[in-house]
Amino acid sequence: MSFRSSSSYSVQSKNVSGGGGFGSSYGGGSSSSFGGGYGAGFGGGYGAGFGGGASSGFSSSSSGGFGAAAASSSFSSFGGNDKQTMQNLNDRLASYLEKVRALEAANADLELKIREWYEKQKGSGIGAASKDFSKYFEIISDLRNKILFATIDNPRVVLQIDDAKLAADDFRLKFENELALRQSVEADINGLRRVLDELTLARGDLEMQIESLTEELAYLKKNHEEEMSIAKGSAAGQVTVEMDAAPGVDLNKILSDMRADYETLAEKNRRDAELWFNQK
C-alpha cells in the first residue's frame, strides 16, 4: 500500500512538473516544489522571467515580469552562472522523474504479481475464502452420529466383557476341578492296573496247577483202569489175592479244595484292591 500512495504522488508531481520546457516547468510546478527551498530566488521569478526562452529572458522579460527592482535583485543573485544553475536543476528534475517512472514501473510490476498470486490462490483453492467445506458437513454429521452411537453402546459392550470375564473365570475353576479329578482317576486306574497284573499272574499260576493236577488225574485214572482189569482177570481165575494197598485218592475232593483256594485268593485280592481304592 505504501507503493500505491507513492505512485499517486509521483503521478501528480509528474503532471504538474511536465509542462512545456523551462517556462512552464518552473513557472507552475517549481513554485510549489522548490518554493520552500529557494525562497524568493526561485519562488516565482522563473514563471515570467523565462516565459519567452532562455536566451532573451534575462533582458526583456525580467522588466515586464518583475519590475525594475525585482529584476535587478534576482539577477544579481545568479550572477553569470545562470545557465549552469538551470542545467543542474533540469538534470536533477530529469533524474527525479526517472526515479518516479522506475518506481511506477516497479509498483505496477508488484501489483501485477500480487494480483496474479491472489488469482492463483483462488484458482488452486488454498485461500480460506475460496474453500468450500459444505461437502464435509454431511460426513462430519455422520461421524458425530457414529460417535454418539458408539458412546451409547460402549457401556453395553463393557457389561458384556465383564460377563465374559466372569464366565471365563467360572469355566477356569471347573476346568481345574475336572483336571484334579482326572488326575485322581488316572492314579486309581494305574493302581488297579497293578492289581490286575498281580491277579493275572495268580490266575496263570492257578491255571498251571490245574493243568498239572488234570494230567495227574488222567494218569491215576489210567492206573486205576489197569488195576481194575488185572483184578477182573484174577477174579476169573478163582484166585484170591489179599493186598494191603493204600486207600485211593479222591480227585474230586482235591479239585474242590483247589477251587476253594483259588476263590479265597481272588476274594482276598479283591478286598485288598477295594481297600486301597477307598483309601485313595
Curated annotation (Swiss-Prot):
UniProt-annotated stretches for the region Linker 1: 118-139
UniProt region (Linker 12), positions on chain: 232-254
Gene3D superfamilies hit by this protein: Single helix bin, Vasodilator-stimulated phosphoprotein
Keyword Heme: no
Region (Coil 2): 255-280
Region annotated Coil 1B, chain positions: 140-231
IF rod domain mapped to chain residues: 82-280
SUPFAM superfamilies named in the record: Intermediate filament protein, coiled coil region
GO terms for cellular component: cytoskeleton; intermediate filament
Alphabetically ordered keywords of this record: Coiled coil, Intermediate filament, Keratin
Domain of life: Eukaryota
Coil 1A: annotated segments: 82-117
Pfam families (alphabetical): Filament
GO terms under biological process: epithelial cell differentiation; intermediate filament organization
RNA-binding among keywords: no
GO molecular function: structural molecule activity
Region (Head): 1-81
Note: There are two types of cytoskeletal and microfibrillar keratin: I (acidic; 40-55 kDa) and II (neutral to basic; 56-70 kDa).
Family: Belongs to the intermediate filament family.
Self-association state and partner proteins as the record states: Heterotetramer of two type I and two type II keratins.
Protein name: Keratin, type I cytoskeletal 47 kDa
